[in-house]
Amino acid sequence: MGGGDGAAFKRPGDGARLQRVLGLGSRREPRSLPAGGPAPRRTAPPPPGHASAGPAAMSSHIAKSESKTSLLKAAAAAASGGSRAPRHGPARDPGLPSRRLPGSCPATPQSSGDPSSRRPLCRPAPREEGARGSQRVLPQAHCRPREALPAAASRPSPSSPLPPARGRDGEERGLSPALGLRGSLRARGRGDSVPAAASEADPFLHRLRPMLSSAFGQDRSLRPEEIEELREAFREFDKDKDGYINCRDLGNCMRTMGYMPTEMELIELSQQINMNLGGHVDFDDFVELMGPKLLAETADMIGVKELRDAFREFDTNGDGEISTSELREAMRKLLGHQVGHRDIEEIIRDVDLNGDGRVDFEEFVRMMSR
C-alpha cells in the first residue's frame, strides 16, 4: 500500500492536487492591479439547485400578465388627455357643485379676441332656492361694471360746499354787512371789477371820513378825562411843586406815558422850551405839547362809548333812530355845508339794512366799522 501511494504521488501535479484537497495549498502571490483600476469581480453562477435560479426568480411576485395590463391601463389614461389633478390642494370631485362665498365674483371663462364677446366681470347672483331660499346673495360694489353706476353717484354730496347765498347789494348772508364793502375795496385795489352798489357807497365813505375825524380824530378837542390824565402826569414830575417842569423831566414824563422820543426830538424840544418858554414848562404848555400826541394815539381807537356819543349827535330827538332829516342836519353841522336830499337818501339806502328808511344804533355801528 505504501508503494502504491508513493507511485501515485510520482505523477506530476498529484502533490498540488492533494494539498488543495486538504486545504494546505500554497498561498498565491497578490497580483498587481492594472492602471485602469480593479477589474470587476466575476461572480460564479449559482449551482443548478439554488432557489434563485430559473426564470421564475427573475420576475416579481405579480404575474407577468397582470403587470403588463396595469402598465397598459396607465399609458392609456395618460394618452386620453384627461384633466390633471391640481398641484396644490385636494382633488375636487367633478360631480359635486362648486361652493362660492356670498359676495364673491364667480369665475368667468376667458373671452375671445372679439371685443363684442366680452361680458361684465360679475353679474348679480340669482336667488338661491331650497333650504337657502331666504338668503339673497348680493354682489359687492367692486363686482359691478363701471357702466352700471347709478346717475345719483355723479350728483354732489350734501357735505359739498355750496355757493354762498347773497342778499341785497351782493352781500353774503350770515356775515357782517361790512364785509361786502371791504371785499369790494380790496378788489378795487387789485384792479378787479367792482359792483355798482359798492361804487355808489364811495361818496358816502368820502363824507364819512370828515365825520370820524371831527368826532374821534385829531381835529377834535381833548376830552375831560384826557386832560385829567395829562394833569396827573405833570404833577408826578413836578418835584418842587412850583407848577413847572424842566426839559429833563419832560423827557422822562413822555417815556412814562408810553411815548419813546428819540434824542433828536428831545434836543429840538429842549431848544424850543429854552427859547420860547425860558427853560421851564407849565401845565398849559405841557398840554399844548402832549395833546396832539395823545389825539394821534387814540384817533383809531373807537369804543362803544364813543360810538354812542356819536350816535347821540346824529339822533337829535333821542328816539333811538336817525331819520333822513336828522342825518342831513348832522352832516351839515359836521361838514359845514348842506347835503342834497338825493345824497342823503343814497346814504340811508346803503346803511339801512332792514329797509325801514331809518338807521338804528346797530346799523350805525356797522356803518362806522366799515
Swiss-Prot record:
EF-hand domain mapped to chain residues: 225-260, 279-296, 302-337, 339-370
One Pfam family, short name: EF-hand_7
Tissue specificity note: Retina and brain. Somatodendritic compartment of neurons. Calbrain was found exclusively in brain where it is abundant in the hippocampus, habenular area in the epithalamus and in the cerebellum.
InterPro entries: CaBP1/2/4/5, EF-hand-dom_pair, EF_Hand_1_Ca_BS, EF_hand_dom
GO cellular component entries: cell cortex; cytoplasm; cytoskeleton; extracellular space; Golgi membrane; perinuclear region of cytoplasm; plasma membrane; postsynaptic density
List of residues that carry Phosphoserine: 323
Name the record gives this protein: Calcium-binding protein 1
Gene designation: CABP1
